């Protein structure tokens, strides 16, 4: 009995000490700093295949519209009306979808931390998927001739008809 109490006390002290330690978050190194402000960099980012126009064209051509439900935010009654129009091959109302793609352009020109934020979740998901499939690199931002990480966002709007 005395031995089991001693064992329990030792276990409590051990786990209390092990899990009671404050974990300190390491400060980011200079290479982990992500710049957001174009005023802070000497050379801004650019897409290697045709600049922003080339990037938008590549994004549009790789987007699978079948994976986007433009009407997902509509009330059920409206969805049923639209489905009926589709089944009768009648024109359906067009929908404008918006999202903002955010990502980090790494010093090697690749993208990381890809996120799409907007109201339509299927559109967000497809934009994230599409962006992850793009293997062409960016021309990274530079400060004093050194390539740096740069936070970038691209607003996207698409009309679904």
Residue ranges and their predicted role:
Residues 4-8, 20-161:
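Charge-biased low-complexity segments
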Residues 11-19:
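Hydrophobic h-region of N-terminal signal peptides that target proteins for export
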